[in-house]
Amino acid sequence: MATLKEKLITPVAAGSTVPSNKITVVGVGQVGMACAISILGKGLCDELALVDVLEDKLKGEMMDLQHGSLFLQTHKIVADKDYAVTANSKIVVVTAGVRQQEGESRLNLVQRNVNVFKFIIPQIVKYSPNCTILVVSNPVDILTYVTWKLSGLPKHRVIGSGCNLDTARFRYLMAERLGIHPTSCHGWILGEHGDSSVAVWSGVNVAGVSLQELNPAMGTDKDSENWKEVHKQVVESAYEVIRLKGYTNWAIGLSVAELCETMLKNLYRVHSVSTLVKGTYGIENDVFLSLPCVLSASGLTSVINQKLKDDEVAQLKKSADTLWSIQKDLKDL
C-alpha cells in the first residue's frame, strides 16, 4: 500500500546529502543564540548545527528555531551534544566557555577555558577538518591562540572575532556625532579586543576626507571636541551594557554573521579580526591581535599594512606583551 507521501511525490533523482554551506555554533548561551539567529536572518547557510553540553537547553533552542522555519531560508537546523552533528561544516563559530567569577584573575579564567577548549577543538577538527574556526569566546585574542595551538589548523583558518565589533561600535558612535550612517564613517580599532584596543585616528575619514586634517588634535588630550571620548566609550560600552542587562549579545551576533557572510560568499571584504601578528610591527611572540584582514572562502587571505604612528605601534606592542605574559604560563597546550 503506497503512503500518502509516495502518492504525492514522484522521485526523479537523489538529492544531495552533504550540505554545501553548513555553519556550526558551539555554545547556545546568549551570544551563541544571537550568532545563530543573525546567521539565519541573513540566509547564509543550508544547514545550521548547534552544540552544547546542556541537553535540554540545546533541544529547546533547536526546536524554537525549527518552528520558525517558514520564515527562514535555512532548510535544516540540527543540534546535539555529540560533535558528529557538526560534520562537514564550512565555518564553526565557538562561543562556549566559562564565565569570569567575581575576583577571579584573567589567567585563572583563561586556564579554565583552555580546559574546556581541550575537549571542544579536537572534536571540531575531527568532524570538519577543512573548516575555518571563528573564535568568539573571551578573552578572544588568547583563546584564538589556544584554538590555533589545539587545532593544528593553519593560521589562516583560525580567526578571532577580535575588534570587528569594537570597530562597529566606533563607527556607530562617530556617526552619531556627525549625523551620518555608520557605513559612511570609516575608522579602525585594532589590537586587543577590550581595554587596550588602539583607535587609529590618523585613518579616520568620511568620503576620503581625513578628520584629523580638519582637527589635528583629534584623539589627543588637547582636543577641545574631546573625540578621544569616543574610543573611551567603545572600550566601556560592553561593561555598560553588561551592567544594564547582564550580558551583551545582539551586536556581537550581528558582527559574527557579517564575518560568516564575507567568508561564505567569498567577498574579500576587510575586517578588523584577530590573527597571528608575529613578525609585524616588531612583535616577536606568537600572539593574536586584530589587524585589518581580508576574508574570503579560504579564511583569512591577507593583512592590510596600516601606516601606524609610533605611539600606535607602541600600544600594539604593549598589548602583545600583556597577552604573551598570560599565554606563556598556560598549561597543557
Curated annotation (Swiss-Prot):
It catalyses: (S)-lactate + NAD(+) = pyruvate + NADH + H(+). NAD(+) binds at residues 29-57, 99, 138. GO terms for molecular function: identical protein binding; L-lactate dehydrogenase activity. Keywords: Cytoplasm, NAD, Oxidoreductase. It is found in: Cytoplasm. Pfam families: Ldh_1_C (PF02866), Ldh_1_N (PF00056). Signal peptide: none annotated. Its EC number is 1.1.1.27. The active site is at 193 (proton acceptor). Belongs to the LDH/MDH superfamily. LDH family. Interconverts simultaneously and stereospecifically pyruvate and lactate with concomitant interconversion of NADH and NAD(+). NCBIfam families: L-LDH-NAD (TIGR01771), PRK00066.1 (NF000824). Homotetramer. This is L-lactate dehydrogenase B chain.
